[in-house]
Regions:
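Beta-hairpin "wing" of winged helix-turn-helix
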Residues: 25-26, 30, 57-67, 71-74
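Short, charge-rich, low-complexity interaction segments located
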Residues: 68-86
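Extreme N-terminal segment that seeds HTH/winged-HTH DNA-binding domains in transcriptional regulators
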Residues: 1-31, 37, 81, 85-121
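N-terminal helix-turn-helix
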Residues: 31-63
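Short Asp/Glu-rich motifs
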Residues: 40, 75-76, 117-118
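Short, mixed-charge, low-aromatic patches
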Residues: 6-12, 45-54, 65-72
Length: 121
């Protein structure tokens, strides 16, 4: 993962971890790798991983079980809300970009549909 020097690394990791949850890479109820393992994988200080994971827990997306480790929440409603938020963020970026290009809504949607069908179907 390439980090943006303009933003705190723990926030970038927080976004990465939320994406893993919202896309199902980290499933509801699944045990998350240890802080040390994640720090090694992302090549960052364990304290940075801990800070991102603590924020996930504060938001209710993970829970720590005293002797078992850290797990993704079983609350599927919360995960669904996270999926919605992730989609809205991407949609906002697309709409902002289309507006910056002075595209009409219908043209932007048609262009996206055509591009999707040509490149991703």
């Amino acid at each position: 993962m390439e980090f943006d020097n303009q933003r705190p690394i723990y926030l970038q990791l927080l976004e990465e971890f939320k994406l893993k949850i919202s896309t199902g890479q980290w499933q509801a109820g699944e045990k998350i790798d240890s802080v040390r393992s994640l720090a090694s994988f992302y090549e960052v200080n364990p304290n940075t991983i801990q800070k991102a994971l603590s924020e996930l827990e504060r938001e209710g997306l993970t829970e720590t079980r005293r002797t078992s480790g850290r797990f993704v929440t079983d609350n599927t409603s919360l995960i669904s809300d996270l999926e919605d938020d992730s989609f809205k963020k991407i949609a906002d970026e697309f709409i902002e970009g289309a507006k910056n290009l002075n595209l009409e809504k219908d043209k932007a949607i048609d262009d996206l549909r055509n591009y999707w069908e040509k490149n991703y179907d």
